[in-house]
Amino acid sequence: MVSYSNNHFAYAFLLLLTIGNTLAFSSSLPDHVQDPNLVVDDVNRSVFNASRRSLAYLSCRTGNPIDDCWRCDPNWETNRQRLADCAIGFGKNAIGGRKGRIYVVTDPANDDPVNPRPGTLRYAVTQEEPLWIIFKRDMVIRLKKELIITSFKTIDGRGSSVHITDGPCLKIHYATNIIIHGINIHDCKPGSGGMIKDGPHHTGWWMQSDGDAVAIFGGKHVWIDHCSLSNCDDGLIDAIHGSTAITISNNHMTHHDKVMLLGHSDSYTQDKNMQVTIAFNHFGEGLVQRMPRCRHGYFHVVNNDYTHWEMYAIGGSASPTIYSQGNRFLAPNTRFNKEVTKHEDAPESKWRDWNWRSEGDMLLNGAYFRESGAEAPSTYARASSLSARPSSLVGSITTTAGTLSCRRGRRC
């Protein structure tokens, strides 16, 4: 008979072996995954394994595979970069500033868009080297113009209450390997055009910004996790112009109209390569539509909690593939807004061929998901015994969506 101590050793050994194999594999993956279903299965395996670990010694008992990867560690503050190993889905290879220096933001007030001062967030995100950016204390940052984030950067708000608000907000422009974690981003406004430093050795002229919380333009390997986003002039998260390899997870979104746009336009066919995973988010109070609104690409929407929408939750046009799995949809009380989905800008004779599938979703208060496309294409029904967590557990999985209160020496 195997003793408990041997079991403990076995769990630890298997966990380390799995992490090592995952890192070795992920380093060789291209931007665009040739078979998106492989990533869907990878998310399913991660969720299934987290569910099993929730019964074991090494787990924080959340069943959320991202959180179970790092939140159990009371020494998270001295091991911040472990977070980069915890992404899942299409954005799983976003390493941010891993292996770079820790850069501490100390100055929230003096935002100079052209000549950023050392100690400011703008100075940090425009450096050439990989950086893991953290914050010395709680702060409110009001940007004068859009913040252009360069490649291989992590913005990590854990341990501080960081708000970016009341001005232009964040932009990822043809950059790669970006992690944005633990930031409150709200009340973002359009920014005037003008000169903005957009790299270590370049300042360019930028057009007026739209007022998005996070705008991704041609970005790849992007992970947005545990942020709280609300009340911006345009979108909360918009990804367009060939952006791909994105995971949007564990966020809390509230009080906003057009929440998330994924795909530039029906005519911009380069977005056919777009691949986005939307997992473990809470779409909360005061939301209207676009959670997300998709075009062309491949979108895996898994284990999210939709507690509020006024028009619809998930929509799209230009034949996107949408796989909705294990979500909880609570329809509004208004009679004519019970439908989760909205097939946009096309007659039924066209959209009935778009591949939209609901699997294991919980539909409450009269909510209904209008499926379309083939009944059992390989997009949805690959032979696998692993699945997302049951929709009945979505409440517990997403209970800490949004920014976290993390303290030194304690589990986060």
UniProtKB/Swiss-Prot annotation:
Pathway: Glycan metabolism; pectin degradation; 2-dehydro-3-deoxy-D-gluconate from pectin: step 2/5. Residues 1-24 form the signal peptide. The keyword Mitochondrion does not apply. Ca(2+) binds at D210, D234, D238. Its EC number is 4.2.2.2. Transmembrane segments: none annotated. Binds 1 Ca(2+) ion. Required for its activity. Belongs to the polysaccharide lyase 1 family. Its cofactor is Ca(2+). InterPro entries: AmbAllergen, Pec_lyase, Pectin_lyas_fold, Pectin_lyase_fold/virulence, PEL. The lineage of its organism: Eukaryota, Viridiplantae, Streptophyta, Embryophyta, Tracheophyta. Keywords: Calcium, Lyase, Metal-binding, Signal. It catalyses: Eliminative cleavage of (1->4)-alpha-D-galacturonan to give oligosaccharides with 4-deoxy-alpha-D-galact-4-enuronosyl groups at their non-reducing ends. GO terms for molecular function: metal ion binding; pectate lyase activity. This is Putative pectate lyase 11. GO terms for cellular component: cytosol. GO terms for biological process: pectin catabolic process; response to nematode. The active site is at R290.
